[in-house]
């Protein structure tokens, strides 16, 4: 084992290897490294490879006598293939420092941040970075796991550079790269194969990636086997469908491709269709079709009442009435009842169609004197409605003009029957008994349903029309007042900025009679949080200032009743203070109603709607938009800009 002093002697010239060839793990121009376990060198043989920080000296010579100053060699300019980012530089700096510390630890020296001080007093001190750890791009070392495994191999022996150099056998030396040889990049490792994807294109990960709406739920909730069709089975003229590899999930199909659900051949071949059965596969009113349009089986409903006071002038805009600000989305069904309606009923319906737009159609409308009711439904839901039936009741016999009475409209949607009644009861502060009589006449005289069968005849009563339907909404001008007089009510209205509505409702005649059970048996009303809707000065926000001084009251109401508890959920209940063309303020309610599947053995409406009104409303809507744009253009062109 040569001593440390002997290793510090200057090296003798050694035979050069052939040009253009560099041994792996060996520096160009340096003698080959001695393998571990080999016998010591014979006289005249090449000296073993030394650490880069100490020059090699032949054995048997006096170091002071043969020591010669070594001229420092300037480092070769590295060839940069690309600009390095701060992250790459930091990574290279950390890897270089860690490799230097590992090499110094193997030699038993202390880390010195990239330079090794020689211990000989006369030996020159210089820093040497291992060539294989250059910062050029083609000399990036392998991962730490590869380096650590190769450092521990016995072939590295006592040469501190052998482990590092052997970890990158294909990397050329920096001197060779500078000399003009083409850089040799290490072979790229093959990328890891991606995880296998299921044929279900409606998986949770893909739904998140494609941002599929959560409300577009699959109408086939049961599991089905995978469906894989060959391209040849689609026919020569039909392109391949992206749903060929889908397994029963139509959720992604409806959001990415089409709302039209594919029909499977095995479902067509199966003879599972039973007329009048709730379990019929593919039935128009069955559970599958209901789940396709309403996954939660809840339909959004808008019910409103307004006493127009016979005014011919309609408000310029009905957006606040039909499209309230608290509703983010339009409803599926709109039912509007009017008392003392305007003389031009067709104009009123046209304004409703114009406001709701082309997404809605007039399913049915009826009139009884000046009582109007209009029923608008989404255009794509008209196929699931039965025939619409109506009935009327007159409560004031002696009157030539039917201003008091009731109007009812009924139909079945899927398997749920609906009844809508709008009424105008007797007016007057003290005529509570007459209003109770109007209610009794209405529930007994309305003849509904006629042709459409009752969904549950065992729970129906011949004496009460409201018991023959699943969901009942009764709304109108009931004319029930606040008892106590104008002075008491005004005192409660003028207490402060926030009106004590519960204190006002303690004087309400309707709530008092409903608690007694004398009217609207089984009905409920949403919580009231708005001011009394009657009686206002026309065009103003002040209550009656005439000599009659009528007491402000909640005359306009919306009530509901259901055969099954919890089927009707009120969402909002309010009035429209912005519509001031009448002495009444419109009152509306938003509801969520549960719908059940039905049977196909009922008479259907067959998609009928008022097409003439639909076209008229759309033309009116377009013409107003054109007029608005022309007004904006004329305003911009007439603007005068003067510079003083």
Swiss-Prot record:
Propeptide residues, chain positions: 642-644
Tissue-wise expression: Detected in brain, heart, pancreas, testis and spleen.
Bias (Low complexity) ranges: 152-163
Chief localization: cytoplasm
Region (Disordered): 1-193
Enzyme nomenclature, EC number: 3.1.3.36, 3.1.3.86
Impact when changing residue 563 to H: In JBTS1; slightly reduced phosphatidylinositol-4,5-bisphosphate 5-phosphatase activity
Entry membrane topology: Peripheral membrane protein
GO biological process, any: phosphatidylinositol biosynthetic process
Family, as annotated: Belongs to the inositol 1,4,5-trisphosphate 5-phosphatase type IV family.
Name of this chain's protein: Phosphatidylinositol polyphosphate 5-phosphatase type IV
Native organism taxonomy: Eukaryota, Metazoa, Chordata, Craniata, Vertebrata
């Amino acid at each position: 084992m040569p001593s440390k002093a002997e290793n510090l002697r200057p090296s003798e010239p050694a035979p050069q290897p052939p040009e253009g060839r560099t041994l792996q793990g060996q520096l160009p121009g340096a003698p080959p490294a001695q393998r571990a376990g080999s016998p010591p060198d014979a006289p005249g043989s090449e000296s073993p490879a030394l650490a880069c920080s100490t020059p090699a000296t032949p054995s048997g010579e006096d170091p002071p006598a043969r020591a010669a100053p070594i001229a420092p060699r300037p480092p070769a300019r590295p060839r940069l293939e690309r600009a390095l980012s701060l992250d790459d530089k930091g990574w290279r700096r950390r890897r270089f420092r860690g490799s230097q510390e590992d090499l110094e630890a193997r030699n038993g020296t202390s880390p010195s941040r990239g330079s090794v001080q020689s211990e000989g007093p006369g030996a020159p001190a210089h820093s040497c970075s291992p060539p294989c750890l250059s910062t050029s791009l083609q000399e990036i070392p392998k991962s730490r796991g590869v380096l650590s495994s190769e450092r521990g191999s016995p072939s590295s022996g006592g040469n501190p550079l052998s482990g590092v150099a052997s970890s990158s056998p294909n990397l050329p030396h920096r001197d060779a790269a500078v000399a003009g040889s083409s850089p040799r990049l290490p072979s790229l490792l093959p990328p890891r194969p991606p995880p296998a994807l299921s044929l279900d294109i409606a998986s949770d990960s893909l739904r998140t990636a494609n941002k599929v709406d959560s409300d577009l739920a699959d109408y086939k909730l049961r599991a089905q086997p995978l469906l894989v069709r060959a391209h040849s089975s689609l026919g020569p003229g039909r392109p391949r469908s992206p749903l060929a590899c889908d397994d029963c999930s139509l959720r992604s199909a409806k959001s990415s491709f089409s709302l039209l659900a594919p029909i499977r051949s095995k479902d067509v071949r199966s003879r599972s269709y039973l007329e009048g059965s709730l379990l019929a596969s593919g039935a128009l009113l069955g559970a599958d079709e209901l789940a396709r349009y309403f996954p939660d089986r809840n339909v959004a409903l808008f019910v409103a009442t307004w006493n127009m006071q016979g005014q011919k002038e309609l408000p310029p805009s009905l957006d606040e009435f039909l499209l309230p600000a608290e509703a983010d989305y339009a409803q599926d069904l709109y039912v509007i009842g009017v008392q003392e309606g305007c003389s031009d009923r067709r104009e009123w319906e046209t304004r409703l169609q114009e406001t709701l737009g082309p997404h809605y159609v007039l399913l049915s409308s009826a009139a009884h004197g000046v009582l109007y009711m209009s029923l608008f439904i989404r255009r794509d839901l008209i196929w699931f409605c039965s025939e619409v039936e109506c009935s009327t009741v007159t409560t004031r016999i002696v009157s030539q003009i039917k201003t008091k009475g009731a109007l009812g409209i009924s139909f079945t949607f899927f398997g749920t029957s609906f009844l809508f009644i709008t009424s105008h009861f007797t007016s007057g502060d003290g005529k509570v008994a007459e209003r109770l009589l109007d209610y009794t006449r209405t529930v007994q005289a309305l003849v509904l349903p006629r042709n459409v069968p009752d969904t549950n005849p065992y729970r129906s009563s011949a004496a009460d029309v409201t018991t023959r339907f699943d969901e009942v909404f009764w709304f109108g001008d009931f004319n029930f007042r606040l008892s106590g007089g104008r002075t008491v009510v005004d005192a409660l209205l003028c207490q402060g900025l926030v009106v004590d509505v519960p204190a006002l409702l303690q004087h309400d005649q309707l709530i008092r009679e409903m608690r007694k059970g004398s009217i609207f048996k089984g009905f409920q009303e949403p919580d009231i949080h708005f001011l009394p809707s009657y009686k206002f000065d026309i065009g103003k926000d002040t209550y009656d200032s005439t000599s009659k001084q009528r007491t402000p009251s909640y005359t306009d109401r919306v009530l509901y009743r259901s055969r099954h508890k919890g089927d009707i959920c009120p969402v909002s209940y309010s009035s429209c203070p912005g519509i001031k063309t009448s002495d009444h303020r419109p009152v509306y309610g938003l509801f969520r109603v549960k719908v059940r599947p039905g049977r196909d053995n009922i008479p259907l409406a067959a998609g009928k709607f008022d097409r003439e009104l639909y076209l008229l409303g759309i033309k009116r809507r377009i013409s107003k938009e054109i007029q608005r744009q022309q007004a904006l253009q004329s305003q911009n062109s007439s603007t005068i800009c003067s510079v003083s």
